[in-house]
Every structure is written in structure tokens, then in C-alpha cells.
């Protein structure tokens, strides 16, 4: 396995991460646990999940895996929420994610865009959780360059925690991140992970 140095955590992270969106949905709990085992045996140390994946079952499966294997400290967890990003919802989701995954912290916790909530309110509550140590770094999902810059202005003005990670779509068919995002994030020490690197299977020739 090849590894990259994630500046935002100062950790070596496997270049291949394991997405857990199908856990508890297309893949049973037992098969998910076996898949996690194989991933770790092959050097993968990044698991990417979400509060909403399989109505929370994905995070619960990770929690069961960590309890069985006693290897939480060896794994970097990425989780996230979308939709309603009110203070009440963010607090509820982060607390439940911690309980589900049987951990006292989540390495990266991401937010998307909620047009109904002021961005400064979202960044303020995420900053609180980072400073409390319940999340190690604040992350964002599908932010474009203008949203990243707007966030930076708010974060610097209020001394809020800055983003440590951007999760965005990037593969050989969708290469928009190459225009500005990659360079900007490199300058701002924001690490990047891509989702749908195989285009949900279309790039592999699965669908004809």
C-alpha cells in the first residue's frame, strides 16, 4: 500500500480508502466486517462513512469492528452530514456518530452547504466540537472555490477552526477539481479525498 502525508493530521494515510456507503444496505453486517478486515490486512487505514449511510447502520458496523479488533487508534475516520445544518442537528448527529462508532473522537467530520443556515453559524458549532476534541479536524463536502474562500474569511475573522479536509468528486471523467480546487487546497493545507473515483462503476466497464 502507498501512503500520503495528510498535512492536516500529520499522519500517513493510505492512498486507497474504504468507502462504507453500502454497509448494512447492499452488504450485510458480517460481510462488512470481513471486508474491513481485508482492507486493514492490505494496509488501508482510512474509512469513509456518513451519519446518514444506511440510516446509521454503516457507522454502527464500524463501531462493532473497532470493539472487536481494538484498532481504533490505527484508523482514520471520515464522517459527515448533509441537509439540515442547524446547531441542534449538528450537535445531535456528532454525538450519535461518536456513540455509534464507539469512539471519543472522529478524525474528520464534514458538512455540506445548507442554504437555510448562515455559514458562520455552521462554522461556529463545528469549531466548538473541534476545540472540545470530539472531532480532530473540521471538513467540508462538495465546496467550490468560492465557498472555501468565504469560509476562510469567516474562520479567520472569528478565530474558528479552519478546514482540514475537502471531500469532492474526482475521477477521469469528472476532473473539475483540477481547475482551482487542488491548487487552492494545497496552498491552504487542506487535504483532499475523492468520492466515486470509479464513477460508480461506469469507468470500469461494468455497465455496457
Model-derived features: positions:
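Beta/alpha (TIM)-barrel catalytic core signal, keyed to glycine-rich beta->alpha loops juxtaposed to Asp/Glu
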Residues: 114-208
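Active-site mouth loops of central-metabolism enzymes
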Residues: 19-30, 80-89, 111-117
Amino acid at each position: 500500500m502507498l501512503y500520503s502525508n495528510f498535512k492536516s493530521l500529520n499522519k500517513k494515510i493510505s492512498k486507497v480508502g474504504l468507502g462504507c456507503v453500502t454497509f448494512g444496505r447492499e452488504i450485510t453486517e458480517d460481510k462488512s466486517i470481513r471486508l474491513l478486515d481485508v482492507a486493514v490486512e492490505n494496509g488501508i487505514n482510512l474509512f469513509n462513512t456518513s451519519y446518514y449511510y444506511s440510516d446509521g447502520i454503516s457507522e454502527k458496523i464500524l463501531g462493532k469492528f473497532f470493539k472487536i479488533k481494538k484498532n481504533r487508534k490505527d484508523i482514520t475516520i471520515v464522517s459527515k452530514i448533509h441537509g439540515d445544518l442547524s446547531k441542534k442537528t449538528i450537535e445531535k448527529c456528532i454525538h450519535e456518530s461518536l456513540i455509534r462508532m464507539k469512539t471519543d473522537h472522529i478524525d474528520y467530520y464534514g458538512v455540506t452547504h445548507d442554504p437555510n443556515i448562515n455559514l458562520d453559524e455552521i462554522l461556529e458549532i463545528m469549531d466548538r466540537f473541534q476545540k472540545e476534541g470530539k472531532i480532530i479536524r473540521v471538513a467540508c463536502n462538495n465546496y467550490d472555490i468560492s465557498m472555501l474562500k468565504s469560509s476562510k474569511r469567516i474562520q479567520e475573522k472569528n478565530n474558528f477552526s479552519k478546514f482540514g479536509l475537502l471531500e469532492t468528486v474526482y475521477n477521469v471523467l469528472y476532473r473539475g477539481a483540477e481547475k482551482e480546487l487542488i491548487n487552492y487546497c494545497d496552498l491552504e493545507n487542506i487535504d483532499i479525498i475523492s468520492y466515486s473515483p470509479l464513477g460508480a462503476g461506469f469507468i470500469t466497464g461494468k455497465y455496457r
